[in-house]
Amino acid sequence: EDLCKTLENGYDFLILCNPNNPTSSAIMQEDLRKLIAFCSGKNIFVMIDETYVEFAPDINAVTAVPLTREFTNLMVLRGVSKFYAAPGMRLGYGITGNREFLAKMKEKQTPWSLNSLGAFAGKKMLLDHDYFRRTRELILGERDRMETELKKLPIFKVYPAYANFILLKIQKEGLTSADVFEACIKKGLMIRDCSSFQCLDGEFVRFCIMMPEDNTRLLDVLKQL
């Protein structure tokens, strides 16, 4: 509702990251439908970046792809940099039901925007269902374990995670995000000090889900703070 009120002020384009970066939160599809419908009535085009959607517990509950059949003011973007760990491929794609918008994009498309290596690798990655299943099992299983263990530590508030990282708010007086970062880096563990993000200054850290043994090492460090 707050976002809709903001959009009343003459905007014509809305970009969302869902699941969100840096919070790892997500907007559910039914709420997205209401938002996109509102934007349609205000002639606002909506672009949703779903780079992290494969990490969501229930992808179908989060993705806006089915909504491209209902709304012409919507485009959904996806890529292979996160879930498929291939940022160097620079490969992504968009889904929209707006043929006019798509035609205009093709007019502006640069020649050879997708090379043969990217096309070959992309097809292999997106059709590798075994990798998809195993990666989700590992990341989602470890994310659930980390959330459960971290909720036992009163010094942190754990936010629900829909991406491959977890956001923590530090609740121990005198302990800063820089302190937590330093404690982790001394043990060879890289986490993100979120002080550079707007509204997350000094009180928030986040970390990506790693292999089980590294996640356990991180838990051990956080328990000692």
Positions of predicted regions on the chain:
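Structural motif
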Residues: 13-17, 47, 93-95
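Short beta-strand-to-loop capping motifs
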Residues: 96, 168-172, 209-211
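Active-site pre-lysine segment of PLP-dependent enzymes
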Residues: 1-10, 22-46, 50-84
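Conserved PLP-binding catalytic core of the aspartate aminotransferase-like
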Residues: 139-140, 153-187
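PLP-dependent enzyme catalytic core of the Aspartate aminotransferase-like
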Residues: 4, 30, 186-187, 196-225
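PLP-dependent aminotransferase class I/II
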Residues: 73-159
